[in-house]
Amino acid sequence: MALDAGLTRTLRELVLGRSVAALGTLHSNEPFVSMVPYALYGEERQFLIHVSALASHTRDMLAQPRVSLLITAPEGGDIAPQALPRLSVQGDALRLNRAGTDYAPARACYLAHFADAAQMFELADFSLFVIRPVSLRFVAGYGKAFSPTPATLALILGSRN
């Protein structure tokens, strides 16, 4: 089954309409899940997160960069929890170097979505990470599961920051 216009719209609204995701990492070889705000960055529509070195998930990403994100539609209405639209992203987390050429535009992108995070950029323990999608699983409801490519997701989401 292919993504039709309605499913494409559902996926786009899900990712662009939410600002937080569950982040799955490996912590001492055990699964660990936390919550992170995200912004979409670059032409590839990668996921940009800003995290503290004090957080377990930051140390986990540095030790093992393979991560997962889960974005879900909010509960409520007439939709059963099992039928909520959701996107699971498996990807690689890369910490951006503050002196690198990608850092300033990534910082501007993140702050465009989360202006109240500006003061955290002044703290030395916070870092920006880009999560580059490798594989995806989009569930739009019962019997509606798809595995779009990262390139397809980027096209669906558009190329704006």
What feature does the model see in each segment?
Residues 1-62:
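An N-terminal domain-cap segment
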Residues 4-9, 108-109, 113-161:
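C-terminal edge-of-domain segments
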Residues 22, 33-37, 88-90, 128-130, ...:
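Conserved hydrophobic/aromatic beta-strand scaffold that supports enzyme active sites
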Residues 25, 35-36, 58, 76-80, ...:
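Catalytic micro-motifs at enzyme active sites that drive phosphoryl/nucleotidyl and oxygen chemistry
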Residues 44-46, 66, 135:
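Structural motif
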Residues 52, 72, 141-142:
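Surface loops and adjacent helix of pleckstrin homology
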